[in-house]
Protein backbone atom coordinates (compact mmCIF):
# COMPACT_ATOMS: atom_id res chain seq x y z
CA UNK A 1 0.00 0.00 0.00
CA UNK A 2 1.49 3.32 -1.00
CA UNK A 3 1.55 6.43 1.17
CA UNK A 4 -1.20 7.90 -0.99
CA UNK A 5 -3.75 6.02 1.11
CA UNK A 6 -3.09 8.46 3.91
CA UNK A 7 -4.23 11.23 1.61
CA UNK A 8 -7.35 9.52 0.43
CA UNK A 9 -8.70 6.53 -1.44
CA UNK A 10 -8.39 5.98 -5.15
CA UNK A 11 -10.20 8.21 -7.61
CA UNK A 12 -13.92 7.68 -7.48
CA UNK A 13 -14.25 7.56 -3.71
CA UNK A 14 -14.61 10.43 -1.25
CA UNK A 15 -11.28 12.02 -0.43
CA UNK A 16 -9.72 11.31 2.93
CA UNK A 17 -6.78 13.63 3.29
CA UNK A 18 -4.17 13.70 6.08
CA UNK A 19 -3.85 15.65 7.78
CA UNK A 20 -6.93 21.72 5.07
CA UNK A 21 -8.57 25.29 1.33
CA UNK A 22 -10.35 26.19 0.29
CA UNK A 23 -12.02 25.74 3.50
CA UNK A 24 -14.56 28.18 2.57
CA UNK A 25 -14.71 28.40 -1.18
CA UNK A 26 -15.21 26.00 -3.99
CA UNK A 27 -13.61 25.82 -7.38
CA UNK A 28 -14.32 28.41 -10.06
CA UNK A 29 -17.01 27.59 -12.59
CA UNK A 30 -16.79 26.73 -16.23
CA UNK A 31 -14.80 29.44 -17.92
CA UNK A 32 -12.79 27.60 -20.54
CA UNK A 33 -13.40 25.13 -23.36
CA UNK A 34 -13.36 21.52 -22.21
CA UNK A 35 -10.12 20.14 -23.61
CA UNK A 36 -9.05 17.84 -20.83
CA UNK A 37 -7.58 15.20 -23.13
CA UNK A 38 -5.16 16.08 -25.86
CA UNK A 39 -6.13 15.12 -29.36
CA UNK A 40 -9.83 15.66 -28.79
CA UNK A 41 -11.62 18.75 -30.15
CA UNK A 42 -12.58 21.40 -27.64
CA UNK A 43 -16.13 21.31 -26.36
CA UNK A 44 -17.34 24.83 -25.59
CA UNK A 45 -19.24 24.97 -22.32
CA UNK A 46 -21.46 27.85 -21.26
CA UNK A 47 -19.78 30.21 -18.84
CA UNK A 48 -21.17 31.02 -15.44
CA UNK A 49 -19.74 34.49 -15.90
CA UNK A 50 -21.17 35.04 -19.36
CA UNK A 51 -23.07 37.89 -20.90
CA UNK A 52 -26.28 35.88 -20.78
CA UNK A 53 -29.01 36.71 -18.30
CA UNK A 54 -30.58 33.27 -18.73
CA UNK A 55 -28.65 31.75 -15.88
CA UNK A 56 -29.47 28.40 -14.32
CA UNK A 57 -29.21 28.57 -10.56
CA UNK A 58 -27.47 25.77 -8.71
CA UNK A 59 -29.48 25.74 -5.51
CA UNK A 60 -27.75 24.62 -2.35
CA UNK A 61 -29.58 22.84 0.46
CA UNK A 62 -30.36 25.06 3.47
CA UNK A 63 -28.05 24.83 6.45
CA UNK A 64 -29.57 22.98 9.40
CA UNK A 65 -27.59 25.23 11.73
CA UNK A 66 -29.06 28.59 10.68
CA UNK A 67 -31.57 28.74 13.55
CA UNK A 68 -30.32 25.78 15.56
CA UNK A 69 -28.94 27.78 18.49
CA UNK A 70 -31.49 30.58 18.45
CA UNK A 71 -33.24 29.40 21.62
CA UNK A 72 -30.16 28.00 23.36
CA UNK A 73 -29.46 29.76 26.64
CA UNK A 74 -25.86 30.41 27.64
CA UNK A 75 -25.51 30.87 31.39
CA UNK A 76 -22.80 33.50 31.96
CA UNK A 77 -22.63 32.70 35.67
CA UNK A 78 -21.88 29.09 34.79
CA UNK A 79 -19.00 30.27 32.61
CA UNK A 80 -17.66 32.29 35.53
CA UNK A 81 -17.67 29.17 37.69
CA UNK A 82 -15.79 27.23 35.00
CA UNK A 83 -13.17 29.97 34.75
CA UNK A 84 -12.60 29.90 38.51
CA UNK A 85 -12.24 26.12 38.54
CA UNK A 86 -9.76 26.29 35.66
CA UNK A 87 -7.69 28.94 37.39
CA UNK A 88 -7.64 26.86 40.56
CA UNK A 89 -6.22 23.84 38.71
CA UNK A 90 -3.62 25.69 36.63
CA UNK A 91 -0.93 25.88 39.35
CA UNK A 92 -1.17 22.13 39.91
CA UNK A 93 -0.84 21.35 36.20
CA UNK A 94 2.03 23.83 35.89
CA UNK A 95 3.76 21.98 38.71
CA UNK A 96 3.25 18.70 36.84
CA UNK A 97 4.97 20.21 33.82
CA UNK A 98 7.88 21.93 35.54
CA UNK A 99 8.58 19.64 38.49
CA UNK A 100 10.62 17.12 36.51
CA UNK A 101 14.30 17.46 37.37
CA UNK A 102 17.47 15.66 36.47
CA UNK A 103 18.62 13.73 33.44
CA UNK A 104 15.20 12.60 32.22
CA UNK A 105 13.42 15.91 32.76
CA UNK A 106 13.45 16.84 29.06
CA UNK A 107 11.84 13.54 28.14
CA UNK A 108 9.18 13.83 30.81
CA UNK A 109 8.41 17.45 30.00
CA UNK A 110 8.20 16.71 26.28
CA UNK A 111 5.70 13.93 26.88
CA UNK A 112 3.73 16.23 29.15
CA UNK A 113 3.77 19.00 26.54
CA UNK A 114 2.37 16.57 23.99
CA UNK A 115 -0.48 15.78 26.38
CA UNK A 116 -1.19 19.47 26.93
CA UNK A 117 -1.22 20.18 23.19
CA UNK A 118 -3.45 17.19 22.43
CA UNK A 119 -5.92 18.05 25.20
CA UNK A 120 -6.16 21.68 24.05
CA UNK A 121 -4.42 23.04 27.15
CA UNK A 122 -1.00 24.17 25.93
CA UNK A 123 -2.01 27.82 25.56
CA UNK A 124 -2.22 28.09 29.35
CA UNK A 125 1.50 27.39 29.67
CA UNK A 126 3.17 28.98 26.65
CA UNK A 127 6.07 30.52 28.58
CA UNK A 128 6.81 27.32 30.49
CA UNK A 129 6.69 25.25 27.30
CA UNK A 130 9.00 27.59 25.40
CA UNK A 131 11.55 27.64 28.23
CA UNK A 132 11.47 23.86 28.59
CA UNK A 133 12.01 23.27 24.87
CA UNK A 134 14.68 25.94 24.49
CA UNK A 135 16.69 24.51 27.37
CA UNK A 136 16.09 20.92 26.33
CA UNK A 137 17.03 21.32 22.69
CA UNK A 138 20.57 22.36 23.58
CA UNK A 139 21.29 18.87 24.92
CA UNK A 140 18.67 16.78 23.13
CA UNK A 141 21.15 14.45 21.38
CA UNK A 142 22.80 13.53 24.66
CA UNK A 143 19.48 13.03 26.43
CA UNK A 144 17.97 10.62 23.90
CA UNK A 145 21.21 8.80 23.05
CA UNK A 146 20.19 5.61 24.83
CA UNK A 147 16.43 5.84 24.37
CA UNK A 148 14.93 2.98 22.37
CA UNK A 149 11.21 3.41 23.05
CA UNK A 150 9.39 4.24 19.80
CA UNK A 151 6.59 6.21 21.45
CA UNK A 152 9.01 8.33 23.48
CA UNK A 153 11.33 9.20 20.58
CA UNK A 154 8.47 9.88 18.16
CA UNK A 155 6.61 12.07 20.62
CA UNK A 156 9.70 14.09 21.54
CA UNK A 157 10.42 14.59 17.84
CA UNK A 158 6.82 15.69 17.20
CA UNK A 159 6.91 18.21 20.04
CA UNK A 160 10.19 19.85 19.07
CA UNK A 161 9.33 20.04 15.35
CA UNK A 162 5.86 21.40 16.15
CA UNK A 163 7.42 24.27 18.07
CA UNK A 164 9.94 25.05 15.34
CA UNK A 165 13.02 23.20 16.61
CA UNK A 166 14.74 21.29 13.81
CA UNK A 167 15.36 18.02 15.59
CA UNK A 168 17.13 15.60 13.27
CA UNK A 169 15.12 12.75 11.78
CA UNK A 170 18.21 10.56 12.13
CA UNK A 171 16.87 9.66 15.58
CA UNK A 172 14.66 7.10 13.85
CA UNK A 173 17.58 5.15 12.40
CA UNK A 174 17.84 3.27 15.71
CA UNK A 175 14.56 1.54 14.81
CA UNK A 176 15.90 -0.01 11.59
CA UNK A 177 17.35 -3.42 10.87
CA UNK A 178 20.72 -3.89 9.20
CA UNK A 179 18.89 -4.32 5.90
CA UNK A 180 17.60 -0.74 6.15
CA UNK A 181 13.99 -1.64 6.89
CA UNK A 182 12.09 -0.74 10.03
CA UNK A 183 12.07 -3.51 12.63
CA UNK A 184 9.08 -5.82 12.35
CA UNK A 185 8.90 -6.03 16.14
CA UNK A 186 7.73 -2.39 16.20
CA UNK A 187 4.40 -3.40 14.67
CA UNK A 188 3.24 -4.88 17.98
CA UNK A 189 3.55 -1.46 19.64
CA UNK A 190 0.32 0.20 18.50
CA UNK A 191 0.85 3.44 20.42
CA UNK A 192 4.43 3.67 19.26
CA UNK A 193 3.40 3.09 15.64
CA UNK A 194 0.75 5.79 15.92
CA UNK A 195 3.29 8.21 17.37
CA UNK A 196 5.71 7.38 14.53
CA UNK A 197 2.94 8.05 12.02
CA UNK A 198 2.22 11.43 13.59
CA UNK A 199 5.91 12.36 13.68
CA UNK A 200 6.33 11.47 10.02
CA UNK A 201 3.88 14.21 9.02
CA UNK A 202 6.40 16.83 10.15
CA UNK A 203 8.91 15.70 7.56
CA UNK A 204 10.70 17.98 5.10
CA UNK A 205 11.88 17.41 1.53
CA UNK A 206 15.12 15.84 2.78
CA UNK A 207 13.70 13.68 5.60
CA UNK A 208 13.68 10.55 3.47
CA UNK A 209 13.55 8.30 6.51
CA UNK A 210 10.23 9.91 7.46
CA UNK A 211 8.83 9.01 4.03
CA UNK A 212 9.70 5.41 4.81
CA UNK A 213 8.29 5.78 8.31
CA UNK A 214 4.99 7.10 6.97
CA UNK A 215 4.61 4.15 4.61
CA UNK A 216 5.58 1.67 7.30
CA UNK A 217 3.32 3.15 9.97
CA UNK A 218 0.34 3.81 7.70
CA UNK A 219 0.20 0.32 6.29
CA UNK A 220 0.43 -1.36 9.68
CA UNK A 221 -1.90 1.01 11.52
CA UNK A 222 -4.70 0.13 9.12
CA UNK A 223 -4.33 -3.51 10.12
CA UNK A 224 -3.98 -2.69 13.81
CA UNK A 225 -7.20 -0.68 13.76
CA UNK A 226 -9.16 -3.34 11.92
CA UNK A 227 -7.96 -6.67 13.30
CA UNK A 228 -9.61 -6.24 16.71
CA UNK A 229 -6.35 -6.63 18.62
CA UNK A 230 -6.37 -3.05 19.95
CA UNK A 231 -8.77 -1.72 22.58
CA UNK A 232 -11.76 -0.11 20.89
CA UNK A 233 -10.87 3.41 22.01
CA UNK A 234 -7.35 3.03 20.59
CA UNK A 235 -8.72 1.70 17.30
CA UNK A 236 -10.98 4.75 17.08
CA UNK A 237 -8.02 7.00 17.83
CA UNK A 238 -5.98 5.35 15.09
CA UNK A 239 -8.79 5.71 12.55
CA UNK A 240 -9.13 9.39 13.40
CA UNK A 241 -5.41 9.87 12.83
CA UNK A 242 -5.45 7.97 9.54
CA UNK A 243 -8.24 10.25 8.38
CA UNK A 244 -6.35 13.45 9.30
CA UNK A 245 -3.03 13.44 11.12
CA UNK A 246 -2.73 15.64 14.19
CA UNK A 247 -0.24 17.97 12.51
CA UNK A 248 -2.72 18.78 9.74
CA UNK A 249 -5.88 18.76 11.86
CA UNK A 250 -7.62 21.65 13.61
CA UNK A 251 -6.46 21.86 17.22
CA UNK A 252 -9.96 22.00 18.68
CA UNK A 253 -10.99 18.85 16.80
CA UNK A 254 -7.90 17.09 18.09
CA UNK A 255 -8.75 18.20 21.63
CA UNK A 256 -12.32 16.90 21.48
CA UNK A 257 -11.17 13.54 20.12
CA UNK A 258 -8.19 13.24 22.46
CA UNK A 259 -10.14 14.01 25.62
CA UNK A 260 -12.45 11.08 24.86
CA UNK A 261 -9.47 8.86 24.05
CA UNK A 262 -7.46 9.90 27.11
CA UNK A 263 -10.37 9.27 29.45
CA UNK A 264 -10.31 5.58 28.47
CA UNK A 265 -6.55 5.20 28.74
CA UNK A 266 -5.38 3.11 31.68
CA UNK A 267 -3.45 5.24 34.14
CA UNK A 268 -4.67 8.61 32.90
CA UNK A 269 -4.24 11.54 35.27
CA UNK A 270 -7.62 12.46 36.77
CA UNK A 271 -6.67 16.06 37.50
CA UNK A 272 -5.41 16.62 33.95
CA UNK A 273 -8.55 15.05 32.52
CA UNK A 274 -10.75 17.24 34.71
CA UNK A 275 -8.78 20.31 33.62
CA UNK A 276 -9.27 19.40 29.95
CA UNK A 277 -13.00 18.85 30.37
CA UNK A 278 -13.50 22.11 32.23
CA UNK A 279 -11.52 23.92 29.56
CA UNK A 280 -13.58 22.46 26.73
CA UNK A 281 -16.87 23.15 28.51
CA UNK A 282 -15.87 26.79 28.84
CA UNK A 283 -14.80 26.98 25.20
CA UNK A 284 -18.02 25.33 24.04
CA UNK A 285 -20.18 27.84 25.91
CA UNK A 286 -18.18 30.70 24.47
CA UNK A 287 -18.64 29.31 20.97
CA UNK A 288 -22.40 29.09 21.47
CA UNK A 289 -22.48 32.66 22.73
CA UNK A 290 -20.54 33.81 19.67
CA UNK A 291 -22.72 31.91 17.21
CA UNK A 292 -25.82 33.50 18.71
CA UNK A 293 -24.25 36.95 18.29
CA UNK A 294 -23.23 36.20 14.72
CA UNK A 295 -26.58 34.72 13.76
CA UNK A 296 -28.37 37.82 15.01
CA UNK A 297 -25.89 40.03 13.18
CA UNK A 298 -26.48 38.15 9.94
CA UNK A 299 -30.26 38.29 10.28
CA UNK A 300 -30.09 42.02 10.96
CA UNK A 301 -28.37 42.45 7.60
CA UNK A 302 -31.54 41.07 5.98
CA UNK A 303 -29.51 39.88 3.02
CA UNK A 304 -30.92 36.41 2.40
CA UNK A 305 -34.37 37.59 1.27
CA UNK A 306 -32.80 40.03 -1.18
CA UNK A 307 -30.58 37.56 -3.01
CA UNK A 308 -31.41 34.98 -5.68
CA UNK A 309 -31.29 31.44 -4.24
CA UNK A 310 -27.68 30.76 -5.27
CA UNK A 311 -26.43 31.64 -1.79
CA UNK A 312 -27.16 30.18 1.62
CA UNK A 313 -26.21 31.43 5.07
CA UNK A 314 -23.62 29.23 6.73
CA UNK A 315 -22.80 31.35 9.77
CA UNK A 316 -22.19 28.45 12.14
CA UNK A 317 -20.06 26.63 9.59
CA UNK A 318 -17.91 29.73 9.06
CA UNK A 319 -17.55 30.20 12.81
CA UNK A 320 -16.38 26.61 13.02
CA UNK A 321 -13.60 27.31 10.53
CA UNK A 322 -12.61 30.44 12.46
CA UNK A 323 -11.68 28.15 15.35
CA UNK A 324 -8.86 26.75 13.20
CA UNK A 325 -6.87 29.89 14.01
CA UNK A 326 -8.54 31.00 17.22
CA UNK A 327 -9.82 28.15 19.37
CA UNK A 328 -8.70 29.57 22.72
CA UNK A 329 -11.18 31.44 24.96
CA UNK A 330 -9.30 34.75 24.89
CA UNK A 331 -9.85 35.10 21.13
CA UNK A 332 -13.63 35.38 21.25
CA UNK A 333 -13.71 38.77 19.51
CA UNK A 334 -11.21 37.55 16.92
CA UNK A 335 -13.45 34.60 16.02
CA UNK A 336 -16.38 36.94 15.52
CA UNK A 337 -14.35 39.22 13.25
CA UNK A 338 -12.95 36.27 11.31
CA UNK A 339 -16.40 34.80 10.78
CA UNK A 340 -17.70 38.07 9.36
CA UNK A 341 -14.75 38.19 7.00
CA UNK A 342 -15.40 34.58 5.97
CA UNK A 343 -19.00 35.48 5.16
CA UNK A 344 -17.82 38.37 2.99
CA UNK A 345 -15.40 36.10 1.15
CA UNK A 346 -17.95 33.36 0.66
CA UNK A 347 -20.53 35.77 -0.74
CA UNK A 348 -18.14 37.12 -3.38
CA UNK A 349 -17.06 33.62 -4.32
CA UNK A 350 -20.58 32.23 -4.63
CA UNK A 351 -21.74 35.29 -6.55
CA UNK A 352 -18.96 34.91 -9.11
CA UNK A 353 -19.14 31.13 -9.05
CA UNK A 354 -22.82 30.42 -9.29
CA UNK A 355 -24.75 33.38 -10.61
CA UNK A 356 -23.18 36.61 -11.88
CA UNK A 357 -22.65 37.42 -15.54
CA UNK A 358 -19.24 38.62 -16.65
CA UNK A 359 -20.30 42.26 -16.69
CA UNK A 360 -21.74 41.91 -13.18
CA UNK A 361 -18.54 40.31 -11.90
CA UNK A 362 -16.55 43.10 -13.52
CA UNK A 363 -18.72 45.79 -11.93
CA UNK A 364 -18.67 44.16 -8.49
CA UNK A 365 -14.92 43.64 -8.44
CA UNK A 366 -14.17 47.09 -9.84
CA UNK A 367 -16.39 48.58 -7.14
CA UNK A 368 -14.54 46.63 -4.47
CA UNK A 369 -11.21 47.92 -5.77
CA UNK A 370 -12.52 51.47 -5.37
CA UNK A 371 -14.46 50.63 -2.19
CA UNK A 372 -17.31 52.56 -3.81
CA UNK A 373 -19.88 51.67 -6.51
CA UNK A 374 -18.58 52.04 -10.06
CA UNK A 375 -20.55 53.77 -12.82
CA UNK A 376 -21.95 50.47 -14.10
CA UNK A 377 -23.41 49.31 -10.79
CA UNK A 378 -26.76 51.07 -11.36
CA UNK A 379 -27.23 49.27 -14.68
CA UNK A 380 -27.17 45.84 -13.06
CA UNK A 381 -29.81 43.97 -11.04
CA UNK A 382 -30.35 45.13 -7.47
CA UNK A 383 -28.93 41.94 -5.97
CA UNK A 384 -25.43 43.11 -6.91
CA UNK A 385 -25.83 46.23 -4.77
CA UNK A 386 -26.95 43.99 -1.89
CA UNK A 387 -23.78 41.92 -2.22
CA UNK A 388 -21.59 45.01 -2.35
CA UNK A 389 -23.28 46.62 0.64
CA UNK A 390 -22.98 43.46 2.75
CA UNK A 391 -19.23 43.33 2.17
CA UNK A 392 -18.76 46.97 3.11
CA UNK A 393 -20.92 46.50 6.20
CA UNK A 394 -18.86 43.50 7.29
CA UNK A 395 -15.67 45.55 7.16
CA UNK A 396 -17.38 48.46 8.90
CA UNK A 397 -18.25 46.09 11.75
CA UNK A 398 -14.59 45.13 11.98
CA UNK A 399 -13.59 48.79 11.94
CA UNK A 400 -15.88 49.57 14.89
CA UNK A 401 -14.07 46.90 16.86
CA UNK A 402 -10.50 47.67 15.82
CA UNK A 403 -10.20 51.43 15.38
CA UNK A 404 -10.75 52.29 19.08
CA UNK A 405 -7.96 49.82 19.88
CA UNK A 406 -5.54 51.60 17.56
CA UNK A 407 -5.45 48.68 15.14
CA UNK A 408 -6.57 50.46 11.98
CA UNK A 409 -3.39 49.36 10.20
CA UNK A 410 -4.39 45.69 10.49
CA UNK A 411 -7.84 46.48 9.14
CA UNK A 412 -6.47 48.37 6.13
CA UNK A 413 -3.98 45.62 5.30
CA UNK A 414 -6.72 43.00 5.50
CA UNK A 415 -8.90 45.11 3.25
CA UNK A 416 -6.08 45.27 0.67
CA UNK A 417 -5.71 41.48 0.76
CA UNK A 418 -9.46 41.16 0.34
CA UNK A 419 -9.33 43.39 -2.74
CA UNK A 420 -6.60 41.18 -4.17
CA UNK A 421 -8.69 38.09 -3.47
CA UNK A 422 -11.72 39.69 -5.13
CA UNK A 423 -9.71 40.76 -8.17
CA UNK A 424 -8.56 37.18 -8.72
CA UNK A 425 -12.20 36.25 -9.41
CA UNK A 426 -12.22 38.80 -12.21
CA UNK A 427 -8.81 37.66 -13.44
CA UNK A 428 -10.15 34.14 -13.92
CA UNK A 429 -13.14 35.52 -15.79
CA UNK A 430 -10.85 37.53 -18.07
CA UNK A 431 -8.83 34.43 -18.85
CA UNK A 432 -12.09 32.86 -19.96
CA UNK A 433 -12.82 35.77 -22.26
CA UNK A 434 -9.56 35.04 -24.07
CA UNK A 435 -11.10 31.74 -25.16
CA UNK A 436 -8.08 29.58 -24.40
CA UNK A 437 -7.38 27.03 -21.72
CA UNK A 438 -4.60 28.53 -19.59
CA UNK A 439 -1.54 26.56 -18.69
CA UNK A 440 -1.55 24.96 -15.28
CA UNK A 441 1.05 27.51 -14.18
CA UNK A 442 -1.16 30.41 -15.33
CA UNK A 443 -4.10 28.90 -13.53
CA UNK A 444 -2.14 28.48 -10.29
CA UNK A 445 -0.83 32.04 -10.44
CA UNK A 446 -4.39 33.32 -10.23
CA UNK A 447 -5.79 30.36 -8.28
CA UNK A 448 -3.50 30.84 -5.28
CA UNK A 449 -5.07 34.24 -4.69
CA UNK A 450 -8.60 33.15 -5.61
CA UNK A 451 -8.62 30.32 -3.09
CA UNK A 452 -8.54 32.90 -0.31
CA UNK A 453 -5.65 31.56 1.76
CA UNK A 454 -3.80 34.88 1.90
CA UNK A 455 -6.84 36.89 2.92
CA UNK A 456 -7.64 34.28 5.57
CA UNK A 457 -4.18 34.77 7.05
CA UNK A 458 -4.65 38.55 6.86
CA UNK A 459 -7.94 38.23 8.73
CA UNK A 460 -6.27 36.05 11.33
CA UNK A 461 -3.57 38.65 11.92
CA UNK A 462 -6.29 41.29 12.16
CA UNK A 463 -7.70 39.42 15.14
CA UNK A 464 -4.42 39.42 17.07
CA UNK A 465 -3.50 42.22 19.44
CA UNK A 466 -0.25 40.74 20.73
CA UNK A 467 1.88 40.95 17.58
CA UNK A 468 3.92 43.52 15.66
CA UNK A 469 1.31 44.21 12.97
CA UNK A 470 3.69 45.90 10.54
CA UNK A 471 6.16 43.02 10.75
CA UNK A 472 3.41 40.41 10.42
CA UNK A 473 1.76 41.97 7.37
CA UNK A 474 5.11 42.67 5.73
CA UNK A 475 5.84 38.95 6.01
CA UNK A 476 2.47 38.14 4.45
CA UNK A 477 2.97 40.62 1.61
CA UNK A 478 6.42 39.21 0.88
CA UNK A 479 4.70 36.03 -0.34
CA UNK A 480 7.45 33.90 1.14
CA UNK A 481 7.90 30.31 0.06
CA UNK A 482 6.28 29.32 3.35
CA UNK A 483 3.15 31.38 2.64
CA UNK A 484 3.04 30.34 -1.01
CA UNK A 485 3.16 26.68 -0.08
CA UNK A 486 0.20 27.07 2.27
CA UNK A 487 -1.88 28.63 -0.51
CA UNK A 488 -0.83 25.92 -2.96
CA UNK A 489 -1.90 23.14 -0.59
CA UNK A 490 -5.30 24.73 -0.10
CA UNK A 491 -5.68 25.16 -3.86
CA UNK A 492 -4.84 21.52 -4.56
CA UNK A 493 -7.21 20.30 -1.85
CA UNK A 494 -10.05 22.40 -3.19
CA UNK A 495 -9.49 21.24 -6.75
CA UNK A 496 -9.40 17.60 -5.70
CA UNK A 497 -12.47 17.74 -3.49
CA UNK A 498 -14.61 19.86 -5.79
CA UNK A 499 -13.79 18.21 -9.11
CA UNK A 500 -16.80 15.93 -9.46
CA UNK A 501 -19.24 18.63 -8.35
CA UNK A 502 -17.63 21.10 -10.75
CA UNK A 503 -18.00 18.70 -13.66
CA UNK A 504 -21.62 17.94 -12.79
CA UNK A 505 -22.33 21.67 -12.97
CA UNK A 506 -20.50 22.00 -16.27
CA UNK A 507 -17.54 23.74 -14.68
CA UNK A 508 -14.39 22.67 -16.49
CA UNK A 509 -11.96 25.46 -15.63
CA UNK A 510 -10.53 23.45 -12.77
CA UNK A 511 -6.92 22.92 -11.89
CA UNK A 512 -7.25 19.25 -12.72
CA UNK A 513 -8.56 19.98 -16.21
CA UNK A 514 -5.83 22.56 -16.87
CA UNK A 515 -3.27 19.97 -15.77
CA UNK A 516 -4.82 17.21 -17.90
CA UNK A 517 -4.94 19.50 -20.91
CA UNK A 518 -1.30 20.55 -20.54
CA UNK A 519 0.23 17.17 -19.77
CA UNK A 520 -2.16 14.83 -21.55
CA UNK A 521 -2.87 12.64 -18.52
CA UNK A 522 -6.06 10.82 -17.55
CA UNK A 523 -8.37 11.64 -14.65
CA UNK A 524 -6.96 8.79 -12.60
CA UNK A 525 -3.43 10.02 -13.25
CA UNK A 526 -4.24 13.64 -12.44
CA UNK A 527 -5.80 12.67 -9.11
CA UNK A 528 -2.64 10.77 -8.27
CA UNK A 529 -0.45 13.69 -9.33
CA UNK A 530 -2.42 16.21 -7.28
CA UNK A 531 -2.20 14.02 -4.19
CA UNK A 532 1.55 13.84 -4.68
CA UNK A 533 1.66 17.62 -5.01
CA UNK A 534 -0.23 17.95 -1.73
CA UNK A 535 2.25 15.66 0.01
CA UNK A 536 5.31 17.34 -1.47
CA UNK A 537 4.08 20.84 -0.74
CA UNK A 538 3.32 19.86 2.86
CA UNK A 539 6.99 18.89 3.18
CA UNK A 540 8.04 22.23 1.69
CA UNK A 541 5.83 24.07 4.15
CA UNK A 542 7.30 22.12 7.08
CA UNK A 543 10.79 22.86 5.81
CA UNK A 544 10.20 26.59 5.37
CA UNK A 545 8.62 26.74 8.82
CA UNK A 546 11.83 25.43 10.38
CA UNK A 547 13.91 27.88 8.34
CA UNK A 548 11.81 30.93 9.19
CA UNK A 549 13.28 31.81 12.56
CA UNK A 550 12.74 35.59 12.49
CA UNK A 551 8.92 35.52 12.52
CA UNK A 552 6.92 34.81 15.71
CA UNK A 553 5.45 31.33 16.03
CA UNK A 554 1.93 32.72 16.46
CA UNK A 555 2.18 34.49 13.09
CA UNK A 556 3.46 31.39 11.32
CA UNK A 557 0.71 29.30 12.87
CA UNK A 558 -1.90 31.32 10.96
CA UNK A 559 -0.70 29.69 7.74
CA UNK A 560 -0.81 26.24 9.29
CA UNK A 561 -4.30 26.96 10.62
CA UNK A 562 -5.48 27.90 7.15
CA UNK A 563 -4.16 24.65 5.70
CA UNK A 564 -5.58 22.61 8.57
CA UNK A 565 -9.06 23.94 7.99
CA UNK A 566 -8.59 23.01 4.35
CA UNK A 567 -7.80 19.43 5.25
CA UNK A 568 -10.83 19.34 7.52
CA UNK A 569 -13.12 21.01 4.99
CA UNK A 570 -12.10 18.73 2.14
CA UNK A 571 -11.46 15.50 4.00
CA UNK A 572 -14.56 13.86 2.55
CA UNK A 573 -15.48 15.87 -0.52
CA UNK A 574 -16.48 19.53 -0.70
CA UNK A 575 -17.35 19.95 2.95
CA UNK A 576 -18.05 23.67 2.86
CA UNK A 577 -20.55 23.63 0.02
CA UNK A 578 -22.00 20.32 1.20
CA UNK A 579 -21.29 20.12 4.96
CA UNK A 580 -23.94 17.52 5.69
CA UNK A 581 -21.39 14.74 6.17
CA UNK A 582 -18.21 14.92 8.24
CA UNK A 583 -18.46 18.66 8.88
CA UNK A 584 -21.86 18.19 10.48
CA UNK A 585 -20.33 15.57 12.77
CA UNK A 586 -17.60 18.00 13.76
CA UNK A 587 -20.15 20.73 14.43
CA UNK A 588 -22.21 18.39 16.56
CA UNK A 589 -19.20 17.32 18.64
CA UNK A 590 -18.08 20.92 19.09
CA UNK A 591 -21.33 22.81 19.65
CA UNK A 592 -23.84 20.20 20.84
CA UNK A 593 -22.30 17.15 22.50
CA UNK A 594 -21.32 17.37 26.14
CA UNK A 595 -18.01 16.17 27.56
UniProtKB/Swiss-Prot annotation:
One of its GO terms (cellular component) is cytoplasm. The keyword Magnesium applies. This is Putative terpenoid synthase 16. Its main location: cytoplasm. Binds 3 Mg(2+) or Mn(2+) ions per subunit. Mg(2+) 2 binds at residues 349, 353. Mg(2+) 1 binds at residues 349, 353. It is found in: Cytoplasm. Pathway: Secondary metabolite biosynthesis; terpenoid biosynthesis. The Asp-Asp-Xaa-Xaa-Asp/Glu (DDXXD/E) motif is important for the catalytic activity, presumably through binding to Mg(2+). Its cofactor is Mg(2+); Mn(2+). Belongs to the terpene synthase family. Tpsa subfamily. Mg(2+) 3 binds at residues 494, 502. One of its GO terms (biological process) is diterpenoid biosynthetic process. The keyword Ion transport does not apply. Its EC number is 4.2.3.-. Keywords: Cytoplasm, Lyase, Magnesium, Manganese, Metal-binding. A motif (DDXXD motif) lies at residues 349-353. One of its GO terms (molecular function) is terpene synthase activity.
Amino acid sequence: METITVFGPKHGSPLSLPSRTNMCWEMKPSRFPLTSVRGKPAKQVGLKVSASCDRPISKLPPSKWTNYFHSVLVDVSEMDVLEREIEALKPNVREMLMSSKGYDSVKKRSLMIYLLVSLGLAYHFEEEIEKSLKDGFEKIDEIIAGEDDLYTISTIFWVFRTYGYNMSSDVFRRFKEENGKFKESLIEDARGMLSLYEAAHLGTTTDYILDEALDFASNNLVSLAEDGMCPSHLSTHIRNALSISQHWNMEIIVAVQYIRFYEQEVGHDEMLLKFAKLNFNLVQRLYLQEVKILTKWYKDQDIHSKLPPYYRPVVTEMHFFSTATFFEPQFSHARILQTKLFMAELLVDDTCDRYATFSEVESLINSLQRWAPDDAMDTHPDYLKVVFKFILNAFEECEKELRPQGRSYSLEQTKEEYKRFAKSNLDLAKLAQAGNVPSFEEYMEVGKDEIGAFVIVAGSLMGMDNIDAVEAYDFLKSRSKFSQSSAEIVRYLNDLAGFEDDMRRGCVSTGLNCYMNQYGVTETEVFREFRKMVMNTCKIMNEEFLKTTDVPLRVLKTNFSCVRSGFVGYNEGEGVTYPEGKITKYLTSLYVDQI
